[in-house]
Regions:
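Active-site and donor-binding regions of nucleotide-sugar-utilizing enzymes
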Residues: 1-83, 232-235
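A nucleotide-sugar donor-handling region in carbohydrate enzymes
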Residues: 47-49, 53-153
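Short, charged, surface-exposed secondary-structure boundary motifs
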Residues: 45-51, 164-165, 213-221, 254-264
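Short loop/turn segments at strand-loop or loop-helix junctions that form parts
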Residues: 13-16, 36-44, 149-161, 190-193, ...
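Catalytic donor nucleotide-activated moiety binding site of glycosyltransferases and closely related
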Residues: 156, 173, 177-210, 265
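Short, charged/polar "capping" segments at the starts of alpha-helices
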Residues: 19-21, 46-47, 161-164, 194-200, ...
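Donor nucleotide-activated moiety binding/catalytic core segment of transferases
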Residues: 192-234, 238-239, 262
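Catalytic binding pocket for nucleotide-activated donors in carbohydrate/polymer assembly enzymes
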Residues: 233-273
């Protein structure tokens, strides 16, 4: 593909991926000035290398980096910060003002245009992706449901996070239930890796395909209120500025780096459960 296109700019959503790095390094054969461009990929664009367990950070940034460089070759680069590899020159971010100083000092930072994600041409492309993400369990879902207006759109965390931070499914359902009382149309989306339907809701609630990226839904769905966990709400606050955005947060996580980031995004309301 690169042999035929000979691109002058290559975009990627995660510059730590081997495919992106190899594509840029290979393209230099045709265009020495080829530009690697990073597209906002969520919290990793703003939080400098978050690891839930310290041993993962040690393995990821030492042994894993060394082994992959030996296996792939000297072109492979791994950095803690997304957008930070040597193959990236430009970074296109939802919130350029929140970019880490390390990124601002080394890369050219540009704002992403929200209107692009609302364009009809892109929506047609996204509609085709919806069908690609559909699984047998989503047989009752239709693309038309993306264009309906909802009172509340709930983006659910993984059940393991619910058990760890919210005291279990019952407590979490009670916390979410406060925002659903008296509401007409409600939609929910489970975490992509969720295997259990733990959310307590009736048949009137629209359940979006779990495998569908939340960012695609935020490009379509109109909802008066979006409730969910911190990471997904960054995209919601950017793509749905007209909606009330609520981050339901368990107490005791004030020092969480991702939550600290969300607090810097003005439209997002932090509500402790």
């Amino acid at each position: 593909l690169i042999d035929s296109l000979q691109p002058v700019r290559i975009f990627g959503g995660n510059d730590r991926r081997e495919e992106f790095q190899y594509a840029v390094s290979y393209a230099e054969k045709y265009t020495p000035q080829v530009v690697g461009a990073y597209l906002d990929d969520g919290t990793g664009s703003y939080v400098n290398g978050v690891y839930l367990r310290k041993w993962r950070a040690i393995v990821d940034l030492t042994a894993d980096r060394l082994l992959k460089r030996v296996f792939y070759g000297p072109w492979y680069d791994k950095q803690r910060l997304l957008g930070g590899t040597r193959w990236v020159k430009e970074c296109y971010l939802n919130f350029p003002d929140l970019a880490p100083e390390e990124l601002k000092s080394r890369k050219d930072i540009f704002p992403l245009e929200r209107e692009v994600f609302r364009a009809d041409s892109l929506r047609r492309l996204l509609e085709s992706l919806v069908d690609a993400y559909r699984t047998p369990s989503d047989e009752d879902f239709s693309v038309a449901q993306l264009y309906q207006e909802y009172d509340v759109f709930v983006v659910l965390p993984h059940s393991k996070a619910v058990a760890r931070y919210f005291g279990g499914e019952k407590s979490y359902n009670e916390a979410i239930g406060k925002y659903l009382k008296g509401k007409g149309k409600v939609a929910v989306k489970y975490h992509p890796r969720e295997s259990r339907f733990y959310f307590d809701c009736d048949a009137s609630v629209t359940v979006f395909p779990a495998s569908l990226p939340a960012e695609i839904l935020f490009s379509f769905v109109q909802s008066k209120c979006v409730v969910g966990d911190s990471s997904a709400l960054l995209s919601a606050a950017w793509l749905m500025p007209e909606s009330r955005t609520i981050c339901l947060c368990p107490r005791g996580l004030d020092e969480n780096p991702i939550l600290s980031l969300v607090k810097r995004v003005p439209p997002v309301e932090i509500v402790y459960s």
